[in-house]
Amino acid sequence: MRLISLLLFVLLLAIQYPLWLGKGGWLRVWDLNRQVNEQTVHNQALKLRNAKLEGEVKDLQDGTGAIEERARYELGMVKDGEVFVQFVAPAPKVSATPPLPPPPNSVAGRGGH
């Protein structure tokens, strides 16, 4: 009886091995699902980037507004008769006097008389 139980247990393990660890087992399916989810997120990011680039290409093909904007911001170009004005944030003030030295060590707790 003990031998039959052991044999059945070994057969059960032999049947379970492909289910969990085989080529189409649960662990492999779980890993593939994780990879599909990661790739889906990556593809969505690429779709957004492609849509942005497609819109930019259409702007460049259809009108001069996008070309003019790029020339202004990326190349620093101005039209004839325009004056370029740039506002710069003020730098923090630097004190002309050096910082005060630290106070000398005082004796604390002696009563001070």
Curated annotation (Swiss-Prot):
Entry's localization field: Cell inner membrane
Question: Which UniProt keywords are listed?
Answer: Cell cycle, Cell division, Cell inner membrane, Cell membrane, Coiled coil, Membrane, Transmembrane, Transmembrane helix
Could you tell me the superkingdom of the organism this chain comes from? Bacteria
Q: Where is the region Disordered? A: 93-113
GO terms in the biological process aspect are: FtsZ-dependent cytokinesis
Transmembrane residue ranges = 4-21
Any one of the GO CC terms = cell division site
Membrane side Periplasmic: residue ranges: 22-113
The UniProt entry, under NCBIfam families, shows: PRK00888.1
Among PANTHER family, the record links this protein to: CELL DIVISION PROTEIN FTSB
Please give the function described in this protein's UniProt entry: Essential cell division protein. May link together the upstream cell division proteins, which are predominantly cytoplasmic, with the downstream cell division proteins, which are predominantly periplasmic.
Q: How does it assemble?
A: Part of a complex composed of FtsB, FtsL and FtsQ.
Protein name as catalogued: Cell division protein FtsB
| Source organism per UniProt | Cupriavidus metallidurans (strain ATCC 43123 / DSM 2839 / NBRC 102507 / CH34) (Ralstonia metallidurans)
Q: Which gene encodes it?
A: ftsB
